Amino acid sequence: MQISNDPSSHSGSLTMYLSEINQYGLLSVEEEQALARKFVKGDLAAGHRLVTSNLRFVVKVSYEYRSYGIKMSDLIQEGNIGLMKAVQKFDPDKGIRLISYAVWWIRAYIQNYILKSWSLVKLGTTQAQRKLFFSLARTRRELEKFGAGDGAVVNVDEIANKLNVKASEVREMEQRMGGRDLSLDAPMGEDGGNSHVDFVASAAAPQDDEFADKEEAGLINSRVHMALMRLDPRERFIIEQRVMNERPMTLKELGEHFGFSRERARQLEIRAKDKLKAELAALLAEVDPDAAAALQ
């Protein structure tokens, strides 16, 4: 699938890139499903349209990671790769919008890029430091948003209390994370009006915008999906039918499906669940050691 997914390749950098991607209209549910089915049959133009119509959402998700000292253009580029991966794997018959599925992949690619890009000196070597790394910026934004009105200053002690860590650990990590990229916060014109990210947000569909803001849910869902993809087809089928289905198969039905006994079906279910827990714990450990430990 060919697409210019690198914001830094545009002569006007992010300004021109944001203007360009907002020229691509949003798709209705019917249009999205029709294009997805065409893409499954090999229509690359349909796949290109699915990608371009959702590029603005990649920018919004990337903006959430702006405090990690990495250029926004790099974060957006990685998010775009995640979007294209999602388009390749999207099933229009599952009953969800593409962006609701794609946000898992977008976040996963961005987070993996951040982990690879940060040196151990900045990121820290312990699990507690890694957790603080991914929690600090988000927690500060939450406290500022729900604090004493717009522009409220949040001190280190408030953040430390929220994260249940020492204030000295927060100060140390903030020093490591110095040098955030504010290019999207800059006003778009000389009159100091809306910022670039405001321009992107204004064109977003409300329901998808709300979904994209649910960072924690998106993160966990992305890890669950990635863990499922590491199972073999039979294990994945067992988990989907016995755990994730609204009307789960009975062990008897599962055994009949594969042609073996109820007891054998039970044994395979236990094995599939154990493997899924191990895979999910390994993935969650990258960003949330506590969640990973809970699975052990």
From Swiss-Prot:
<dbReference type="InterPro" id="IPR007630">
    <property type="entry name" value="RNA_pol_sigma70_r4"/>
</dbReference>
<dbReference type="Pfam" id="PF04545">
    <property type="entry name" value="Sigma70_r4"/>
</dbReference>
<dbReference type="InterPro" id="IPR013324">
    <property type="entry name" value="RNA_pol_sigma_r3/r4-like"/>
</dbReference>
<feature type="short sequence motif" description="Polymerase core binding">
    <location>
        <begin position="74"/>
        <end position="87"/>
    </location>
</feature>
<comment type="function">
    <text>Sigma factors are initiation factors that promote the attachment of RNA polymerase to specific initiation sites and are then released.</text>
</comment>
<keyword id="KW-0805">Transcription regulation</keyword>
<keyword id="KW-0804">Transcription</keyword>
<dbReference type="GO" id="GO:0003677">
    <property type="term" value="F:DNA binding"/>
</dbReference>
<keyword id="KW-0731">Sigma factor</keyword>
<comment type="similarity">
    <text>Belongs to the sigma-70 factor family.</text>
</comment>
<dbReference type="GO" id="GO:0006352">
    <property type="term" value="P:DNA-templated transcription initiation"/>
</dbReference>
<dbReference type="InterPro" id="IPR050813">
    <property type="entry name" value="Sigma-70_Factor"/>
</dbReference>
<dbReference type="InterPro" id="IPR014284">
    <property type="entry name" value="RNA_pol_sigma-70_dom"/>
</dbReference>
<dbReference type="GO" id="GO:0016987">
    <property type="term" value="F:sigma factor activity"/>
</dbReference>
<dbReference type="InterPro" id="IPR007627">
    <property type="entry name" value="RNA_pol_sigma70_r2"/>
</dbReference>
<feature type="DNA-binding region" description="H-T-H motif">
    <location>
        <begin position="251"/>
        <end position="270"/>
    </location>
</feature>
<dbReference type="InterPro" id="IPR009042">
    <property type="entry name" value="RNA_pol_sigma70_r1_2"/>
</dbReference>
<dbReference type="InterPro" id="IPR013325">
    <property type="entry name" value="RNA_pol_sigma_r2"/>
</dbReference>
<dbReference type="InterPro" id="IPR000943">
    <property type="entry name" value="RNA_pol_sigma70"/>
</dbReference>
<dbReference type="Pfam" id="PF04542">
    <property type="entry name" value="Sigma70_r2"/>
</dbReference>
<dbReference type="Pfam" id="PF00140">
    <property type="entry name" value="Sigma70_r1_2"/>
</dbReference>
<keyword id="KW-0238">DNA-binding</keyword>
<protein>
    <recommendedName>
        <fullName>RNA polymerase sigma-B factor</fullName>
    </recommendedName>
</protein>
